[in-house]
């Protein structure tokens, strides 16, 4: 799932669901980085997109945390 799939509905999920999304993206990022180091990665643009998706979700989580205080 790349940024195109992260819509407002995903950002309206609970914090637990967003944290699960972050873990899923981090696992996928790890896999892509491993493939990159081995030399079998064909779509290197996905690494950048997933890193940005993780940042977007974490930004939303931090905004919620600061808003709750």
Curated annotation (Swiss-Prot):
Any one Pfam family here would be Ribosomal_L29
Q: Name one GO cellular component term.
A: ribonucleoprotein complex
Family affiliation: Belongs to the universal ribosomal protein uL29 family.
A single MF term (Gene Ontology): structural constituent of ribosome
Keyword Ribonucleoprotein assigned to the entry: answer is yes
Family matches, as Gene3D superfamilies: 1.10.287.310
Query: Which key words tag this protein in UniProt?
Result: Ribonucleoprotein, Ribosomal protein
Its GO biological process terms?
A: translation
Query: Superkingdom, according to UniProt?
Result: Bacteria
Q: Where is the signal peptide?
A: none
Q: Write the protein's name.
A: Large ribosomal subunit protein uL29
């Amino acid at each position: 799932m790349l940024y195109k799939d992260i819509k407002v509905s995903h950002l309206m999920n609970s914090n637990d669901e967003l944290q699960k999304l972050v873990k899923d993206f981090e696992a996928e990022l790890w896999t892509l980085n491993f493939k990159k180091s081995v030399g079998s990665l064909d779509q290197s643009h996905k690494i950048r997109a997933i890193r940005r998706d993780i940042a977007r979700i974490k930004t939303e989580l931090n905004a919620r945390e600061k808003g709750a205080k």
